[in-house]
Amino acid sequence: SGSCEVKTCWKAMPPFRKVGNVLKEKFDGATEVEQKKIGSAKVLVPKNSQFKPHTDEDLVYLDSSPDFCDHDLKNGVLGTAGRQCNKTSKAIDGCELMCCGRGFHTEEVEIVERCSCKF
């Protein structure tokens, strides 16, 4: 019939939130590794022998993160002292985690706003 059909395919990134969730999951399960020389090859093995060997899909790291609790200008860490935390959260914004066991002061604040409600 003389007509042509063109099919074009392309790869697209998933939504940013999905990428972030996958990275966070990998970060939470990351394995600390060290280099070992086996023959003439250098391989990465878990620093803790009780951990399973990592796969090509796993996130691994060689050096531990600095202690983010304390002020450390050398590593660019501002520390967490004086920061506002969420008393009910179990995540990184929660007081138990953010305050690094130093304890925290609570403050109850009442905010009154006009809401332009119509009855």
Swiss-Prot record:
Localization: Secreted, Extracellular space, Extracellular matrix
Family of this protein: Belongs to the Wnt family.
Protein name in UniProt: Protein Wnt-4
Cysteines engaged in disulfide bonds, as pairs: C69-C100, C85-C95
UniProt superkingdom: Eukaryota
Ranges in coiled-coil conformation: none
GO biological process: canonical Wnt signaling pathway; cell fate commitment; neuron differentiation
Modification comment: Palmitoleoylation is required for efficient binding to frizzled receptors. Depalmitoleoylation leads to Wnt signaling pathway inhibition.
Function summary: Ligand for members of the frizzled family of seven transmembrane receptors. Plays an important role in embryonic development.
Species of provenance: Plethodon jordani
Keyword hit for Lipoprotein: yes
